[in-house]
Amino acid sequence: MFEVFRDLFNPQEDGVTQAAINGTDVLDVAREQVLERGVGLDQAQTLQVLQLPDERLDDLLSLAHEVRMRWCGPDVEVEGIISLKTGGCPEDCHFCSQSGLFASPVRSAWLDVPSLVEAAKQTAKTGATEFCIVAAVRGPDERLLAQVAAGIEAIRNEVDIQIACSLGMLTEEQVQRLADMGVHRYNHNLETARSFFPNVVTTHTWEERWDTLNMVREAGMEVCCGGILGMGETLEQRAEFAANLAELNPHEVPLNFLNPRPGTPFGDLEVLPASEALKAVAAFRLALPRTMLRFAGGREITLGDLGAKKGILGGINAVIVGNYLTTLGRPAEADLQLLDDLQMPIKALNATL
């Protein structure tokens, strides 16, 4: 008899969350646990948030904004990024047009030091406090590290801005060299939940990325780690990813949304619905109440202008301005005007040192 009733009533299929079954509302729980006490939602609670119906979205975003203001404050950190080495990467990240294994239109190219300095100057003019040097590699070789060192020295001589790097997986010796160069923050994304990672990358493991991040923290650099939503992961795996990040406890989490690139294995995937993307933004804020949560790639195609505004009023407290590595972003002026319209102050450089 129990089997019959179980088959007739599946709470998840009927859109009923465990919180509703237990007679508690997950947003009420989050208000007391996260907003009042600063304790992030666990994996099961985050899943309940992701399963909320669309009619609860505004309430969810409002609560996430309150949490962000309570535990992070009103300031928004602005960052620009530049690709030092583009394309020709030996890894097979299925979302990435920079892989040399796929028939994408992106070709390998290097940027010289004067171009790096000019990009840093233009980034600083927007009010950004962070400039991130990125390279499409499995990990840096000696040539790349020498170019990074020369670029950092030249930038420091001419631009008052903090420098971050994203150069793939590192050895312990490479981590220390970057720290000695004065790299403020290191980005290395886990990309997705541990259980879903083999569907995204097969040429290296999730654990290899995790090891790099731990070495970065031990060397005294800030850890920046996020990923891409909308690569075919389930809501359960999205909640798992938030829990993975909460365990890592990075200083910053960049949230990207898949922008399907021609020639890649994920090139034909559908763009994530805006409501799902916004629920994820709010859910990650409730799971990571004190973490810098940054709007990154794909938000233009996924959310548009209105969605970007809702995200900044729904838990986001950092943005990448200008273009991304291989795709166009919003004009920096548009993001800066949006922050001004929302009366969100840009974090000052001296407040982040």
From Swiss-Prot:
GO biological process: biotin biosynthetic process
Entries under Pfam families matching the protein: BATS, Radical_SAM
Residues engaged in binding [2Fe-2S] cluster: 132, 165, 224, 294
Binding residue positions for [4Fe-4S] cluster: 89, 93, 96
Radical SAM core domain sequence ranges: 74-299
Disulfide bonds listed in the record: none
Enzyme Commission number: 2.8.1.6
CDD domains in alphabetical order: Radical_SAM
Recorded superkingdom: Bacteria
Pathway assigned to this chain's UniProt record: Cofactor biosynthesis; biotin biosynthesis; biotin from 7,8-diaminononanoate: step 2/2
Cofactor binding: number and manner: Binds 1 [4Fe-4S] cluster. The cluster is coordinated with 3 cysteines and an exchangeable S-adenosyl-L-methionine. Binds 1 [2Fe-2S] cluster. The cluster is coordinated with 3 cysteines and 1 arginine.
Record SUPFAM superfamilies: Radical SAM enzymes (SSF102114)
Keyword Magnesium annotated: no
Regulation: Requires the biotin synthase auxiliary protein BsaP for activity.
Assembly, per entry: Homodimer.
Purpose: Catalyzes the conversion of dethiobiotin (DTB) to biotin by the insertion of a sulfur atom into dethiobiotin via a radical-based mechanism.
Protein name, per record: Biotin synthase
Species annotation: Mycolicibacterium smegmatis (strain ATCC 700084 / mc(2)155)
Top-level taxonomy: Bacteria, Bacillati, Actinomycetota, Actinomycetes, Mycobacteriales
Gene: bioB
